[in-house]
Amino acid sequence: MTIEVVQADHFRIPLPVVLSDSTHGEMSHFGLVTVRIHCANGQQGLGYTYCVGDIGGDAIRSLLERELAPLLIGSDASAVESLWERMWWHLHFVGRGGIAAFAMAAVDIALWDLRARVDGKPLWRFLGGEDPHVAAYAGGIDLQFTLAELEAQTRGFLDAGFRAIKMKVGRDDLGEDVERVKAMRGWLGPDIALMADANMRWSVDEAIDAARALRPYDLTWLEEPTIPDDVEGHARIAREGGIPIASGENLHTVYEFQRLITAGGVAFPEPDVANIGGITPWLAVARAAQAKNLPVTTHGVHDLQVHLLAATPNASYLEVHGFGLDRFMPEPLVIEEGMARAPNRVGHGVDLDWESLASHRAPRE
């Protein structure tokens, strides 16, 4: 399967409501960068990545077009792992994460999609999965929601079939966070899983104080309590805070995950396939977690990552993220009784409506 064309496209997708967290502030749109790989035999694979507020979207598209497309054209598309290594070392001096990992992710996802399509299997089954069902939670991006808005969102999530919900914390006043988490637990009762996400808002000491204050509300995990670079800080929060820690959406290499896992700084490693370099390194993170008897969860791009968790023996929850593409997909992800179901369509099964997306094409800068 010789690669003939690597087509990159960049879109700016408006959000139906303004979302908010403690780091990125208010978000009205996100960037979507897609890659379509066309082979000489007519086969095609699709990959994509995304960025908050479309920061970096044009740079990712440019990197794909100027560096990765010329590197890949003429190569055998079935050699997925070796092509990943080639991209990694080609971009190593300026990469090792950052926008390079986003660009590599879009390509790697497209190659795995192509590989599964050629084999005639859905991606989850191609990767060795037996059951397409994965426990899922609704990821609220709701830090500035009023309590009434938070309750309305929660009712909507429950009505949509979710049996686990994540909310944002990290307001200026810790007392407000406690009040909101207490209210959420009251609405949910004891049987619905509740997670809280601080988006790196706190120092280590502040995170420990927050974890201790939130401990009475039976959180499944506290996510990103501090900056991802502070590995020892994460370990200390895990030891002293009393709540399991989830982290990883801002870790863009396998090596960063290995350090955090080895240090005891995370109970739920949380790779995002769209920013860690794709499926190839995502699977390596899942194996590293399994070796330490840890479950792996996800961040973002749920339509892709449902396949990965369905094929992973140490799978935890799938995040169903607010940056969804449902309106551009004829068959969005199905949620029933708290479980997401990976589709049985060949490849990853994401079939985008390119005509609808066309009106959101980003201008070239």
Model-identified regions with their sequence ranges:
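Flexible C-terminal active-site loop/helix
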Residues: 1-15, 27, 32, 299-365
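N-terminal basic, low-complexity leaders that serve as flexible interaction/assembly modules and, when applicable
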Residues: 1-70, 357-365
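Metal- or metallocofactor-binding catalytic centers and their adjacent structured scaffolds
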Residues: 5, 38-118
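N-terminal small/glycine-rich loop or linker at the start of catalytic domains
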Residues: 118-142, 180, 189
